Amino acid sequence: MAVVTLKQLLEAGVHFGHQTRRWNPKMKPFIYAERNGIYIIDLQKTYEQLEAAYSFVRDASKEGKTVLFVGTKRQAQEPIREEAERAGMPYVNQRWIGGFLTNFRTIRTRIKKYKELLALREQGYIESLDYKEQKRVMRELEKLDKYYSGVKDMDTLPDILFVVDTKKEEAAIREAKKIGIPVVAMIDTNCDPDLVDYPIPANDDAVRAIKLITSKIADAILEGREGRQGIVSSEGQQASMEEIAEELEAIDETEKYLDLIDEEKEEE
C-alpha cells in the first residue's frame, strides 16, 4: 500500500518546478521535462523519495524521537503549524532564530522565560501590574509567543528536522548538519538535494503541495507512535509519468504562479 498516489501528487501541483533559468543542476535526476519555460518534477521520483522519507520518519517515531517541523515562508506557515500540532511535534513557522540548534542552551532559557510569563498571565498577575509595566511585559510576551509558541514544550534538541524550502531555511539546515541532525526536506528545482538526508522533490511554493507532503510526514509520525496508518488506496499508484504526460502538455507557466499559489511566487 502506498502513502500517496501519483494522482494525488499531480492534483496538488507537486510537479511544478521553477522557471528553467532558476534551477540547480543537481536537481536534474529529479526532473521529468521542461514545459513552456518551467521544469516539471518527475512525480515517480517524488513518490519514491517520499516513501523513503516516510519510512525513516515512521521508524524514528516508533523509537520516540522528535521531529521539528520548519517552514517560515508565507505559504508554509499554516500547513507546518497544523500538521505539527496534529502529530504532537514542535514547529518553527515564523523567523528562524539563529543558534536555535547550535546554541540551544540559550534558546531553552528563552523558552523557560516564555513559559513563566504564560503562567503569570494565566494567574492574572500581569493584570495587577501598573499600566506601563503591564504594557512592557505584554510586549515581551507577544514577541516570545510569535517565535516560541511552537516549541514551548521542547526541552531537548530534536532528532530530525522536516523542512519546507531548503533555500529559505538554509540557516536551519546548516545548524542541523553541524550537529548531526538528519534533515528531511521538500526540495524544488532551484535547491541543492545534497544538503539534506532525505530530499523530496516537490513544488515548495504551492500551499496544496506543501500541505500534502507535510501531512504525509505527520502521518508517518502518527503511524510510528500509535500504529495509526496514514496509507491510501493503492489505486493509481502504479501510473507512470508517461501515462500522465498528457496532463502536462498544456501546462502554462502561470499555473505554478497563479493556479496553485494563493499569492505570487516569492522571489529568491
Swiss-Prot record:
Pfam families: Ribosomal_S2. Keywords: Ribonucleoprotein, Ribosomal protein. GO terms for biological process: translation. InterPro entries: Ribosomal_uS2, Ribosomal_uS2_bac/mit/plastid, Ribosomal_uS2_CS, Ribosomal_uS2_flav_dom_sf. GO terms for cellular component: cytosolic small ribosomal subunit. One of its GO terms (molecular function) is structural constituent of ribosome. SUPFAM superfamilies: Ribosomal protein S2 (SSF52313). It comes from the Bacteria. PANTHER family: 30S RIBOSOMAL PROTEIN S2 PROKARYOTIC AND ORGANELLAR (PTHR12534), SMALL RIBOSOMAL SUBUNIT PROTEIN US2M (PTHR12534:SF0). Belongs to the universal ribosomal protein uS2 family. This is Small ribosomal subunit protein uS2. The lineage of its organism: Bacteria, Pseudomonadati, Coprothermobacterota, Coprothermobacteria, Coprothermobacterales.
